Curated annotation (Swiss-Prot):
<dbReference type="GO" id="GO:0046782">
    <property type="term" value="P:regulation of viral transcription"/>
</dbReference>
<keyword id="KW-0863">Zinc-finger</keyword>
<dbReference type="Pfam" id="PF08792">
    <property type="entry name" value="A2L_zn_ribbon"/>
</dbReference>
<protein>
    <recommendedName>
        <fullName>Zinc finger protein B385R</fullName>
    </recommendedName>
</protein>
<keyword id="KW-0479">Metal-binding</keyword>
<dbReference type="GO" id="GO:0008270">
    <property type="term" value="F:zinc ion binding"/>
</dbReference>
<keyword id="KW-0862">Zinc</keyword>
<dbReference type="Pfam" id="PF04947">
    <property type="entry name" value="Pox_VLTF3"/>
</dbReference>
<dbReference type="InterPro" id="IPR014900">
    <property type="entry name" value="VLTF-3_Zn_ribbon"/>
</dbReference>
<comment type="similarity">
    <text>Belongs to the asfivirus B385R family.</text>
</comment>
<dbReference type="InterPro" id="IPR007031">
    <property type="entry name" value="Poxvirus_VLTF3"/>
</dbReference>
<feature type="zinc finger region" description="C2H2-type">
    <location>
        <begin position="166"/>
        <end position="190"/>
    </location>
</feature>
<keyword id="KW-0426">Late protein</keyword>
Amino acid sequence: MDEIINKYQAVEKLFKEIQQGLAAYDQYKTLISEMMHYNNHIKQEYFNFLMIISPYLIRAHSGETLRNKVNNEIKRLILVENINTKISKTLVSVNFLLQKKLSTDGVKTKNMWCTNNPMLQVKTAHNLFKQLCDTQSKTQWVQTLKYKECKYCHTDMVFNTTQFGLQCPNCGCIQELMGTIFDETHFYNHDGQKAKSGIFNPNRHYRFWIEHILGRNPEQELGTKQDPCGTKVLQQLKKIIKRDNKCIALLTVENIRKMLKEINRTDLNNCVSLILRKLTGVGPPQISESILLRGEYIFTEAIKIREKVCKKGRINRNYYPYYIYKIFDAILPPNDTTNRRILQYIHLQGNDTLANNDSEWESICMELPEIKWKPTDRTHCVHFF
């Protein structure tokens, strides 16, 4: 517990130092505003953490015999609530902002912001902040920016109509084209009505499903008006687990979906990853932002190609988790067993539908050089719990 508190305090000190150090520079007002957003977010997370553990702290001082039991319960809560990941996710965003600003100022930096260690991320952010301050003490020359070159991988970027800018095909970084007017006629149909956003903006579908597959969706989604926190649902599932003598550590997505069907709560099928984390204490792998961005770029391209090559007469709607499964199965190395656990949290449809999806995916891969086609193997996922 002390380790978590130290991490929160280190992050708070970092934000304060950045705010004070950059306040004198007008060009950093936007950056400071974004930093304050993350600062407020981390303070709220810290408050929530203290609220969760406060009852246990009171019990810890009530008697020596309870202390070990209480400490173990606090450790379990830290794991279940994913505290370290929440801190790390905020710091990843902060370091990305600092690194992006340095690159805009013409300063080359090493891409170190994807580490999952919060204390190393604080150190990285501090070093980036010092570099940012140092650039102000040097003479600033007007530079010609190479808009078509990615700032991080130095590869040629391609135009992305959904993001109104350029996007790197390697890391997924987006370069906004300032002061550019776009022709928006392709966003409207012949009747003058705006087209469905799902066709021209697949990014929002990707982000929705990634959030749910990684169990990052709000816990309030499990609740109802009568049961805001979803406590009743979790209790019902625990009763079924006990009744069927299931091993909690070996629960799968399919197990949870069957149990949800039994209690007539299939509306929570999208929340299976979150439920698994709440029940087992083990959540999906925390994929780095660089990999997620690359996945988003490939996903966007795949959906665009699908609209062109989809078979006529097929009425099945896009099942976006299938695309996410195929993309991560392709871009994650076979020996990366930690990150490849994400495949275990993606539900695949029935055999007939899966065969049709594979056939369609093969057509997409012919125009998608980033992905090499291979048939889906249901037995490919091995449990690493």
